[in-house]
Amino acid sequence: IEMYEKFHLKRNLKLQQNYIAQIEFGIRASDSIEKAKKSVLEILRQKHPPTAIFASNDVLALAVLKAAFELKICVPKNLSLIGMDDIFSASASTPAITTVSKERYKLGQLSAKRLIYKLSNVDLELPERILMSCGLLERGTVSAPFNI
C-alpha cells in the first residue's frame, strides 16, 4: 500500500482510497480467499471500478478472480490482475495469474544463514537490508487497458 501511495504522490495523481483493501489472513487459505473476495466485490461494484488490480500475494489474486467471475467481469479484457509469489495455484487457475516471482529458495537460504548467525551471536544486532531480484511472469490475466 505504501508504494501505491508513493506512486500517486510522486505523480500528483489522486489517491483512490476506495480501491484499497487490507485483508487479514486467517488460518485457512480458503477463509482468507472468501474474506478477500467480499472486499473485492465491494471495490468492483463501485460506480467507477478499477481496470487493474495488484494483489499483494497470489492467494488474494485468486480471490480477485473469484469476485470477477461472480460479477461476470472478463479477466483480462475488462480487468487486469497481477499477484505476487508465484504459488502453484497461480499457474493452475483459469486464466493463469500473472505474478511477480521471488527467489524463494534463495530467500530461504539467506534467512536460515541469518538465523544461524544470530543464534551464535546473540548480543549482536546487525540491521541489514537485502535486496533480491524478482521477475514478472506474464500469464493470462493482463492486457492493455480497454478504455484507451
Predicted regions and their residues:
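Short beta-strand elements in bilobed, periplasmic/extracellular small-molecule ligand-binding domains
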Residues: 1, 5-33
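Adenosine-nucleotide cofactor-binding segment
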Residues: 36
